[in-house]
Design a protein with these regions (language model features):
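Conserved acidic carboxylate
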Residues: 11
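Charged docking surfaces used in two-component/phosphorelay signaling
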Residues: 18-26
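Acidic, metal-coordinating helix/loop segments flanking the phosphotransfer/catalytic sites
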Residues: 33-53
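Acidic catalytic/metal-coordinating carboxylates
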Residues: 36, 64-69
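Active-site residues of response regulator receiver
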Residues: 57-58
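Short amphipathic alpha-helix used as the core "switch/output" element in two-component signaling
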Residues: 67-80
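C-terminal output helix
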Residues: 108-121, 125-126
Length: 128
């Protein structure tokens, strides 16, 4: 299990957390779940090189949203792979979207999430 890429997931809805976690495990990833943006940033800072990708809900309860968590991840690594999830309109995507990221609109199939993370990691590997 140690050779599986660890993906940090920040999602405040337990039902969606469970779906995302199950999908990532089935896809060969090791998910690390953070229920808030603040906790996700703490985990990122504490394990700067331990996470291979971030899956972030755009709209989170609390002081920090998914865009803010992604900004912190990109401070650590400007090319950090990020999958954004949103149930809202994607209107803000052009303003916030950054290279090496994918936006998934809820609801999405679990396989779409696995494909998105895999694609970002493959793209990152081929650039290196």
């Amino acid at each position: 299990m140690a050779d599986q890429p660890v993906v940090l997931v920040v999602e405040d809805d337990q039902g969606i957390q469970s779906i995302v976690e199950d999908a990532l495990v089935e896809g060969g990833f090791e998910p690390a779940i953070a229920p808030s943006g603040e906790e996700a940033v703490t985990l990122l800072r504490g394990n700067r090189n331990g996470y291979r990708a971030l899956v972030a809900d755009v709209k989170l309860r609390g002081r920090m949203d998914g865009w803010e968590v992604a900004r912190h991840a990109r401070e650590i690594d400007p090319e950090f792979p990020i999958v954004y999830m949103t149930g809202a309109s994607a209107d803000q995507w052009p303003a916030h979207g950054v290279p090496n990221s994918i936006l998934l609109q809820k609801p999405f199939a679990p396989a779409q999430l696995v494909t998105a993370v895999s694609q970002l990691l493959i793209n990152r590997t081929t650039k290196a």
